[in-house]
Amino acid sequence: MDNKVLVKELITVSILHRCHIMTDASQTGLYFGQPMMLEYILSHPDCTQRELAKALNISPASAATSLGRIEKSGFIARRQDEADSRKNRLSVTESGLKALEAFRAVCDTTDTQLLSGFGEDEREQLFSFLQRLHENLAQNISREDLRKTIKSGGKR
């Protein structure tokens, strides 16, 4: 089989997966990139905007824009740092936690649909194939190049 056919199918599956999640997740009030931010804030309570941006490999300006939208939706709260009034500490609100839980449920449903009809042996075999694909590509790229690509949204 031609490499291009295989790679095109792999990319198509990835796009369909993302499309299903983002379409179904729209009812949660969360949009692309926001769940990742909420997950980080939830696991790093009282983090700063700068810490969040650094951890997610995004610019502070991008973080500020996204956090503004998330805050407007009522999913996070900002609290001024007691030691440094220039910093704001971030926390997930109760409604943010509910939205995140709903988003996780959407992901679980989509993942179940994606892998329906696959037996345990097939899942293990698929995992093995995906690990090999990962290794094939990872060996020729530096961590810094990967970080830059992620930060630029894939644009070079």
Model-derived regions, located:
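Charged, amphipathic alpha-helical coiled-coil/dimerization segments
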Residues: G68-Q131, E135
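N-terminal helix-turn-helix DNA-binding core of bacterial DNA-binding proteins
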Residues: I15, C19-S62, D145
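Membrane-interacting alpha-helical segments
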Residues: N3-K4, S59-P60, N88-V92, D145-R156
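C-terminal regulatory/oligomerization modules of transcriptional regulators
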Residues: D121-R156
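Short, locally clustered residues in the helix-turn-helix/winged-helix DNA-binding domain
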Residues: I11, E39-S43, R104, Q131
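N-terminal leader segment of winged-helix/HTH proteins
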Residues: M1-T28, R156
